[in-house]
Every structure is written in structure tokens, then in C-alpha cells.
């Protein structure tokens, strides 16, 4: 049996239980460099726990998913946060779930507009990178160091994401 999921717009308020939305928020803007640069300050905080841990910056290249897509697993990082910021102006999906006793609950799906990134908080259940429509590259900031920083969970039943380009979602 499978369960249909709805796709929600990505907003700071809706995503707050899972981490931070990374976008050019006018409330956080300040001018620097003699007024030549707009700095959008402190949009998210990086978390890297454990002795010998550090923060690394990566580029991930995500292949587009085929929709409808069945979510059958989720992952989380118990020792650090993980952020994804797109390098191209392409929509992408963010799939998260609240923790229910060391297992993910029902997934929630957000569509990011291509100018929005996210920072998953430590221990937040999420699906791996979900590009839509084309190969997409992302700057990924996460933790490196000793210790197991990956837990996976496989659902007994699938949760289905409809095609995000379908007319019903516009």
C-alpha cells in the first residue's frame, strides 16, 4: 500500500521544525564593503558535534527524479547539520519528517523555488537530494570527522510524491 503526499511551498515558518530556509531575507540584509555588497547575515547555523569534527563544503550533483516518486527511506545525521543551496535557478524538492521515537513519521514535501536552500538541523529525518527536471548542482555544507553521522530508516509502505510540474500544483 502507498500513501499520497502533498507538496507545500517552502517557507521559513513551515520548515522551522526541521531547520532553516536559506534565502535572501531582507530582514537580515546589511551593507558591507563600502556599500557595494548586500550581506544577508546569519541565515543558518552549522552544527558539527564531536571531538575532531570539522565543517566541509562540497558540491553535490543530483540526477533528476522520476515522478510520481515513491519515498521508501529517510536518513538523518546525529552529529551535525547539513545544508543544501542550489547553484542553478531550478526548483527542487525537500522531503522531511518529524521524529517519532527514533523513526521518521509521515514525510512532508516542500518545493524550493531554486533560489532557496535549506539547513537540516542535527537529527532531522530527510530524504536524500531530490532534483526536479534536470541535473542540478548544490553547495552542501556538512560535518566531517570520526563517528557515525548517518542513520537510515526504510518504511514498510511507500509514500508517493506527485509530479511537481503537474498543473494541479500551480
Curated annotation (Swiss-Prot):
Pfam families: Ureidogly_lyase. InterPro entries: RmlC_Cupin_sf (IPR011051), UAH_cupin (IPR047233), Ureidogly_lyase (IPR007247), Ureidogly_lyase_bac (IPR023525), Ureidoglycolate_lyase_dom_sf (IPR024060). Its cofactor is Ni(2+). It catalyses: (S)-ureidoglycolate = urea + glyoxylate. Pathway: Nitrogen metabolism; (S)-allantoin degradation. GO terms for biological process: allantoin catabolic process; purine nucleobase catabolic process. Homodimer. Catalyzes the catabolism of the allantoin degradation intermediate (S)-ureidoglycolate, generating urea and glyoxylate. Involved in the utilization of allantoin as nitrogen source. This is Ureidoglycolate lyase 1. The gene is allA1.
Amino acid at each position: 500500500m502507498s500513501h499520497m503526499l502533498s507538496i507545500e511551498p517552502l517557507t521559513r515558518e513551515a520548515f522551522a521544525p526541521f531547520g532553516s530556509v536559506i534565502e535572501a531575507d531582507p530582514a537580515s540584509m546589511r551593507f558591507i564593503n563600502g556599500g557595494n555588497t548586500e550581506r544577508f547575515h546569519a541565515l543558518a547555523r552549522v552544527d558539527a558535534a564531536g571531538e575532531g569534527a570539522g565543517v566541509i563544503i562540497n558540491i553535490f550533483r543530483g540526477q533528476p527524479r522520476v515522478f510520481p516518486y515513491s519515498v521508501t527511506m529517510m536518513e538523518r545525521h546525529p552529529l551535525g547539520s547539513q545544508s543544501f543551496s542550489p547553484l542553478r535557478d531550478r526548483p527542487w524538492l525537500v522531503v522531511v519528517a518529524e521524529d517519532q521515537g527514533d523513526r521518521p513519521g509521515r514525510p512532508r514535501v516542500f518545493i524550493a523555488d531554486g533560489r532557496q536552500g535549506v539547513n537540516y538541523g542535527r537529527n532531522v529525518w530527510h530524504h536524500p537530494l531530490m532534483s526536479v527536471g534536470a541535473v542540478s548542482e548544490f553547495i552542501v555544507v556538512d560535518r566531517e570527522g570520526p563517528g557515525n553521522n548517518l542513520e537510515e530508516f526504510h518504511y514498510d509502505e511507500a509514500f508517493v510524491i506527485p509530479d511537481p510540474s503537474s498543473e494541479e500544483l500551480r
